[in-house]
């Protein structure tokens, strides 16, 4: 076979669309087996709920199961570190969040991974405010009454969060500093155990993402006193924002999907496309909206910029509050 014939044949095949770049073939072959989506919190919390919604729809789109695995610990650091050190082959992903990526690491003296360099941040999923909830038999019927009670009885009231470094934890620290109240923080390894103890009467209050809080409030099991968003939540228009009562106390939790650094670009690009398609579907927009969440269909570049902005935004706040989780 002559060199000229080979070259001519290759050009003809390429023109016919029978040849594709190696990367395209790589992406088409992926995934060949099930994918693990690591949730660095226990079952039952906001991260877990959103992960399971995404896993079901991503699995349908990718034609392979996306299996949620819960790996809690150290305020979401353990599970996230597990993914950072996993094979960069697209088969182990993580639900990235405030506590593990930004601004959580700013509150720690050391981290086992670099939140920027050790991951490919594939896409954002969405954001939502935290809700400040109490059990139904709590004497405080409003946020004003809770703050008044806290001021009258310094150190006697407690509140929980899903763990040190989480958005709920940071909201609580900001509230204590700005409102000048002395409350005891009780950290948990995830939302599920904290909600159980709140319902059981072991806690006074809980900062929890509205994704999880909404169901408990609508069912009448817990009472929502305030939210951390800049504006009132549409689902609960009579519930005030914290910033209405204590100026400057606001913030939102966020979720994204990330892979280990060095995961091949064709794989991360395929995942990005599927995640964004899921988020832009009418079904998912409605489902997340019903949970009090704002979908944020950002690609990898926008997600990285968002994370870097979160670092800049919260760094001075954390420094002023002298927040350290280790």
Task: Identify the residue ranges that each predicted region occupies.
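N-terminal secretory signal peptides and thylakoid transit peptides that target proteins
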Residues: 2-17
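Short loop/turn segments at beta->alpha junctions
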Residues: 6, 75, 142, 187-190, ...
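N-terminal signal peptide c-region/cleavage motif recognized by signal peptidases
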Residues: 22-24
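N-terminal (or domain-start) structured segment
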Residues: 26-117, 156, 181-204, 297, ...
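An extracytoplasmic/periplasmic, membrane-proximal ligand-sensing/linker region
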Residues: 32-34, 178, 218, 265-326
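Hinge/capping helix and adjacent helix->loop/strand transition within the periplasmic-binding protein
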Residues: 85-91, 106-193, 242, 247, ...
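A ligand-binding cleft/hinge motif common to bilobed small-molecule-binding domains
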Residues: 101-110, 176-178, 205-237
């Amino acid at each position: 076979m002559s060199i000229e014939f080979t070259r001519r044949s290759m050009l003809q095949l390429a023109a016919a669309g029978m040849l594709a770049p190696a990367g395209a073939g790589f992406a088409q072959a992926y995934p060949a087996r099930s994918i693990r989506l690591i949730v660095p919190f226990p079952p039952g919390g906001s991260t877990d709920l959103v992960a399971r919604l995404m896993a079901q729809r991503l699995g349908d789109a990718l034609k392979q199961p996306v299996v949620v695995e819960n790996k809690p610990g150290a305020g979401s650091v353990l599970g996230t570190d597990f993914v950072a050190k996993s094979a960069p082959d697209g088969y182990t992903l993580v639900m990235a969040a405030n506590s593990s990526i930004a601004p959580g690491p700013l509150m720690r003296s050391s981290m086992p991974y670099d939140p920027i360099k050790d991951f490919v941040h594939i896409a954002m999923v969405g954001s939502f405010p935290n809700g400040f909830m109490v059990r139904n038999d709590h004497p405080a019927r409003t946020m004003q009454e809770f703050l008044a009670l806290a001021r009258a009885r310094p150190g006697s009231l407690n509140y929980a969060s899903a763990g040190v470094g989480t958005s709920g934890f940071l909201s609580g620290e900001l509230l204590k500093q700005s409102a000048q109240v002395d409350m005891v923080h009780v950290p948990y390894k995830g939302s599920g155990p904290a909600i159980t103890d709140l319902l059981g009467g072991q806690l006074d209050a809980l900062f929890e993402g509205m994704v999880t809080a909404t169901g408990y409030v609508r069912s009448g099991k817990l009472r929502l006193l305030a939210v951390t968003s800049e504006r009132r939540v549409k689902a609960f228009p009579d519930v005030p924002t914290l910033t209405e009562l204590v100026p400057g106390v606001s913030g939102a939790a966020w979720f994204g999907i990330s892979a280990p650094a060095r995961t091949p670009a064709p794989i991360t690009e395929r995942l990005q496309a599927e995640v964004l398609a899921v988020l832009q579907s009418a079904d998912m927009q409605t489902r997340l909206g019903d949970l009090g969440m704002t979908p944020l269909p950002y690609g990898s570049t926008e997600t990285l910029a968002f994370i870097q902005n979160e670092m800049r935004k919260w760094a001075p706040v954390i420094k002023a509050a002298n927040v350290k989780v280790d």
